[in-house]
From Swiss-Prot:
It holds the Pfam family RapZ-like_N. ATP binds at G19, V20, S21, G22, G23, G24, R25, S26. Disulfide bonds: none annotated. GO terms for molecular function: ATP binding; GTP binding. SUPFAM superfamilies: P-loop containing nucleoside triphosphate hydrolases. This is Nucleotide-binding protein Sare_3328. Displays ATPase and GTPase activities. Belongs to the RapZ-like family. GTP binds at D70, V71, R72, S73. Keywords: ATP-binding, GTP-binding, Nucleotide-binding. It comes from the Bacteria.
Amino acid sequence: MPSGSDLSDTDTTLVVVTGVSGGGRSTVARALENVGYYVVDNLPQALMLDMAELAMKAGGAARRTAMVLDVRSRAFSTDLVGAIRELKERGFAPWVVFVDADDEVLIRRFESVRRSHPLQGEGRLADGIAVERGLLEGARDQADVIVDTSHLNVNQLRRRIEELFGAEDARRLRVTVVSFGFKYGVPPDADFVCDARFLPNPYWVPELREHTGQTEAVSSYVLGQEGAEAFVATYTDLINATTAGFEREGKRYLTVAVGCTGGKHRSVAIAEELAARLGRTVIAANTQHRDLGRE
């Protein structure tokens, strides 16, 4: 295709998947196939533009194409950033998905399957992970979506990707409301963090202690507390007020994290209610309860 062609009027949906080794790229690739994407694994960065143009020309199922890339050389980050920039200059609007996980989680995953890290060489596993993170820094900065798989199993990761890309309109801003426990750490990919610990804790109500915020009893208790309604309404208005700006800036995915002490009662109830209210507006919203079952 001649240089400078404008492809902005095409309906090709292009996804670029990269991330750390052991993070779950293969699971992401399979999930994208499940929702109708034509997936090309281990594609060299130099062929990204050619692949995008072929997908546009081919039409049909190939119009939804995903390219999965991993670190193959020390020039990876520079090459990928340049390739993404070229795609945008040629009129494509790729979604860039970066799959990540905590170092400790990656080490456990490699040790559980008795594999060495591809960049480990003669050094330690942690050394290979550190080298790869350095090479991927520029690629991570380009990401529209950062999927942290530290606390996701294979099925949860698959569902997360299907929620993101299963709809035909893959360019719309999507919101995931994540409940979590502060004692387990704040989700690293959060755009907004809401602290629900000002509400009375159902843990101290004997008949509610063993139930979660997904139950009617706990939800009614939490949402009926003084300040709960104003809290949910304020964050609903805040998120609704920012979505148009995020979309103008090209942001595709928004993570709203709602925390309480352990991530079982208050944060879960608030997250469910917040997602429900956002879903009644123009926003596509879903929930993820990161720390349920960890206590």
